[in-house]
Regions:
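Ordered alpha/beta subdomains of enzyme catalytic regions
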Residues: 1-210
């Protein structure tokens, strides 16, 4: 199971969802996946992807997660987080298939304040399964070497930045390794937008470490 918690997403997805509730509570919307590379996939890939998407329906906010978000995100009212504790991803609302050219199509249609929550988890799942099926292996030595160079540049020139890698991550394990390195050595990294990592590993407020 790739996405194991509702918090494995970017914080702005929650703020966007709340904005839709306040401004457009009855508006419907559609999230459409667009593969700019026009990658050709296999039926085995599609089967694995559908299995992961089915798993999304099992996700629930835990009491600990709810408490963490209400405490650290007071710019969103508690009633919103309590609503999220009853929210469930619905695989039946996700249309996923390969066309005749083996290109991947994904569409999710629902109320805007719900459909926006599907985007990041779906993209993270597609990315990780794609790397797995295409035999791509992360070279952690190379990743950490390049990351160290960027951290050194940031530290030297006081360049502030944030980590927003969830939707395009190679895998959840690679993202965690990168975030740990940033947390330990990047003086001007303001944090991660991934609520799960902010909650689970670093005892920092969502987004901000410093």
């Amino acid at each position: 199971m790739i996405v194991k918690t509702l918090l494995d997403t970017d914080l702005y997805k929650f703020t966007t969802s709340y904005a839709y509730i306040k401004l457009f509570p009855y508006a419907m919307g559609t999230f459409s996946f667009n593969d700019r590379n026009e990658t050709q996939y296999t039926e085995d890939f599609l089967k694995a992807l559908k299995a992961e998407i089915k798993n999304l329906s099992q996700l629930r906010f835990t009491e600990e997660e709810l408490e963490y978000m209400t405490k650290n995100c007071r710019f969103l009212p508690r009633v919103y987080w309590e609503w999220l504790s009853s929210f469930r991803f619905d695989p039946n609302k996700i249309d996923i298939h390969l066309d005749e050219a083996c290109h991947l199509h994904i569409e999710v249609t629902d109320l805007l304040y719900k459909v926006t929550l599907y985007e990041v988890p779906l993209l993270a799942i597609v990315s990780e399964i794609k790397n797995r099926f295409f035999g791509n292996v992360a070279d952690m030595n190379e990743i950490l070497c390049k990351l160290s160079e960027k951290i050194e540049l940031s530290n030297q020139h006081q360049l502030r930045f944030s980590e927003f890698g969830t939707r395009r991550r190679f895998s959840i394990d690679v993202q965690e390794t990168v975030i740990k390195k940033l947390n330990e050595t990047a003086q001007y990294c303001t944090g991660t937008s991934n609520c799960n990592f902010a909650n689970r590993s670093y005892e920092k407020s969502v987004i901000y470490w410093k």
